[in-house]
Amino acid sequence: MAVNGTGNGTGDGDFSLKETSPNIGNGGVNGGEKLTSSFDLVEAMHFLYARIVRARALPVNDSFVAVKIGSYKGRTKQILNSNPNPEFHETFAFTKTRLQGDILEVVVRNRDNPNEDDIVGKCKFDVAEIPTRVPPDSPLAPQWYRLEDRNGVKIGGEIMVSVWIGTQADEVFSEAWHSDSASVTGENVVNTRSKVYLSPRLWYLRVNVIEAQDLVLLHPNRINPEILIKGFLGNVVVRSRISQTKSVSPVWNEDMMFVAVEPFDDSLILSVEDKVGPREECLGRCEIKLSQVERRVLPGPVPSLWYNVEHIGETGEGRRFAGRIHLRVSLDGGYHVLDESIQYSSDYRASAKLLWTPPIGVLELGVLNATGLMPMKSRGGRGTTDAYCVAKYGTKWVRTRTIVDTFDPKWNEQYTWEVYDPYTVITIGVFDNLKLFGAGNENRLINDSRIGKIRIRLSTLVTSKIYTHSYPLMVLKPDGVKKMGEIQLAVRFTATSMMDMLQKYTEPLLPEMHYISPLSIYQLDSLRHQATHILCINLGRNEPALGRDVVEYMLDVGSNIWSLRRGRANFERLVSFFDGWIDAWKWFDEICKWKSPVTSVLVHIVCLFVVFLPKYCVFSMLLYCFVFGLYRFGLRPRHPPHMDIKLSKADSALPDELDEEFDVFPSSKSGDVLKRRYDRLRGIAGRMMIVLGDLATQGERVKSLLSWRDPRATSLFLTFCFVSCGVICFVSMKLLLTFLAFYVMRHPRVRVFDIPSIPQNFFRRLPSRADSIL
């Protein structure tokens, strides 16, 4: 894919990162300004707020209130309790720059007469006379206003209203009805609001199944029963292996791991099952309440207990004793429950709050605006986009309000997080809201469309500096990478204690339990899947709900699925790392070939310096690193890293490779497509197999030096070792090293090129176990 474009970005073409100068902090900002006021990372947006509190002495019982200015109109919910003194407690926010009139009207209407010309009463406010209120000023007290009829005559009934000009810093901003989403009505209005979510605290539940005794089989004459344990926690099922002890007293000594969520209201159910052919028959169950399970914070043994196993009849009655099971159950709070990909994690703290250290800083994010968004759907015969942002860091998720029907939405919302480790990543995703115009049941089945995602690693940011950049929003689709627009962000990472932050670089990344009692890769993968499932359920219960599709996209679920594109990208990263070593080897080879006699002579002199003055050699190397690091300070990166399509190989991936990457697991393909992909994977795996075999061969040749597998080679090596011992006893080590270095770098006149050296010839003749491979 050809990518062209211009700009002052750090990437190529339209996918570049651009530095911006937004009007934040009561004026423009330049990269290093340190603004400190509240909401100083966003542009101030002024709103006309109208808070409808209550009404009294209305001449009708079922009423609602409409608030309008110009063509914008919002309305409260209808009060259907036949009450002439209704309570509303709703707030309306009109963007001041888009006001289409000078008079704000608050109109009380009767539910039974929805006619626009038929009103119960109203009151008017001149916009020019409305006061301005900016936090931390106290909220304006609401006042009672007499209602007027259409002719301006005072009538019976009053309404309590508070009206003011404010900004997005107002406390009611997130709960208010906004004029930029006026086309959304009814129960869908809640899906346009901003929201702060907190992830539940998750713990690992460890169930060490030791043994069972006196199990009662359903078939008393059965010989060699195959007993296993099934664990149920919520919707999660974990199976043990079949016990190797084929009796009614089986032994396992196996760990079963679950993810449990506070406040531990659930119960763990263990089912003892006998595998009879393809079926598994339940011999009995045991229920353990999580609230009664011991919580383990530090490494140490947990006492084991015996639990009764009860068999329950098909009707749920007739419980009877079916044996005993020996368990060691604990809630392990010393682990960090991984719900994100480890390389993009935003938190590494243990589950137990007792193990938390004080925060080392504060992260502030200003979500300013987006520009040039692509049409995501069609409404009214034209393309449109209803965009909102979601940001996740640690256990705190934030969601901006939805800006309806615009390709250039302005949010200007600011959020803060406490930082406990600088080696963490904040993730910002942009989505198109598809839950604004459907019915409630329909909305639950709709997935919001992805517009793009940004990751920013805090350790790459200079503390107290404001970064204002426009990030490209990219989505990889089966037909290639596509730019969906740009989002402008302002980010600042402030350290509360520089010493505490520097100390973090000396501490383990994960809590101690991950190293003292490590979990297997399989367990971590299964537990991460469980944690993601719990978060999806928990965040989906809020209003507005964060859908499973949004949560999984933010948590990077599916990142471990095979992708040829990512495999090529990682291979090139590895090659890039070795490029420096390869260049150094080529340079040394040129020294040995004396292509530049002056350089070769200088290297010989340096070699003598290293051999005879090793102390100064180490000193020189450290000094060189120090000076070179200072020199590189002027060339340091000025921008935070961003998604690179060239590094990701997204611009050169073939359609079939992308189609394979987006295929479900297990694959939905069949026939020739699946055969072609399988053959391609076999070719890649075959090359990897050869490389691994070559590495194993070299290692086995080293081991064979003393194995006497080749008696002549071992004899030669032992003779060499014995002679070398004698030489070292009588010849100075410095002279030996000098001779060895000069021999390696000897002049071409005393060297035969293109012929392997004696050590190489000897090493290649050593045996390996490759001869034993079938």
Swiss-Prot record:
Tissue/organ expression: Observed in flowers.
Cofactors, names only: Ca(2+)
Keywords: Calcium, Endoplasmic reticulum, Membrane, Metal-binding, Repeat, Transmembrane, Transmembrane helix
Coiled coil as UniProt keyword: no
Region feature Disordered, mapped onto this chain: 1-30
Residues binding Ca(2+) 2: N110, D112, D118
GO-annotated cellular components: endoplasmic reticulum membrane
Keyword 4Fe-4S attributed: no
Descriptive protein name: Multiple C2 domain and transmembrane region protein 11
Organism expressing this protein natively: Arabidopsis thaliana
The gene coding this protein: MCTP11
Binding positions for Ca(2+) 1 per the UniProt entry: D62, N110, D112
Family statement drawn from the similarity comment of this UniProt entry: Belongs to the MCTP family.
Function: May function as a signaling molecule by regulating the trafficking of other regulators.
Subcellular location: Endoplasmic reticulum membrane
Entry membrane topology: Multi-pass membrane protein
GO molecular function term, any single one: metal ion binding
Listed transmembrane segments: 608-628, 722-742
Taxonomic superkingdom: Eukaryota
InterPro entries, sorted: C2_dom, C2_domain_sf, C2B_MCTP_PRT_plant, C2C_MCTP_PRT_plant, C2D_MCTP_PRT_plant, MCTP_C, QUIRKY-like
Sequence ranges of Gly residues compositional bias: 1-12
Domain named C2: residues: 9-145, 184-307, 338-471
